Amino acid sequence: MMKKTLISVILLLAIVFSTHAQQHCFFTHYSTEDGLSQNTVMNILQDHKDNLWFATWDGINRFNGYTFKTYKARQGNYISLTNNRVDRIYEDRYGFLWLLTYDNRVHRFDPKTETFEQVPAAGEEGSAFNVHTIEVMPNGTVWLLTENDGAIRILTHPNENHRLTWDIYSSKTELFPSLHVFKVYQDKAGNDWLLTDNGLGMIHPGKKEPDSYFTETKGKFGGMNQAFYAVQDRKS
């Protein structure tokens, strides 16, 4: 009886404190009148310094808790932002921001220098691919998943001024037997798993060539329809 009473009291106190806390909640509405560059916000990110970043239809906005600062392409500014309409924003382990714009292009933003760069660089192979998803891995690797051209793996080299290199995983480049990668997952060992419409691929840390699984090939790269959409790294 004492145990039941104690549980009841704890639950009652939890309800009271929860109700009490709700009474002190408040909301602040921010708009272009407060410095936001555009009222249509597509995505919000909190970075490792607790700044809030807003992806809008007119560039990205940084909010430090007091004021907004806008970063976008302006006429006469030689910065590599192909479109001011930003749909998604992510942060990697090095503090760089990765942006997916309305024209399906990807840009890396450096908050320190406040500059953009298109990735892959304009004119390079893969720069015209239509990217629909950015996957940021815990180890700093960034994957760009395209509509019909496979996936692009972006590597950052911190000891070389954070220089970028990339590889295209696609049946067109003969590096990977698929054009459609649905998801990339990094397991506890640092292996990158690619879930595709044609089986699974796995890339070991520090390696370029993938291992393919569950793919029955008819020809060199033509395969059966074995699509994978989810993966789980179970505890041993």
Feature locations, PLM:
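Carboxylate-rich, polar loop motifs that coordinate divalent cations or form catalytic acidic clusters
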Residues: 1-236
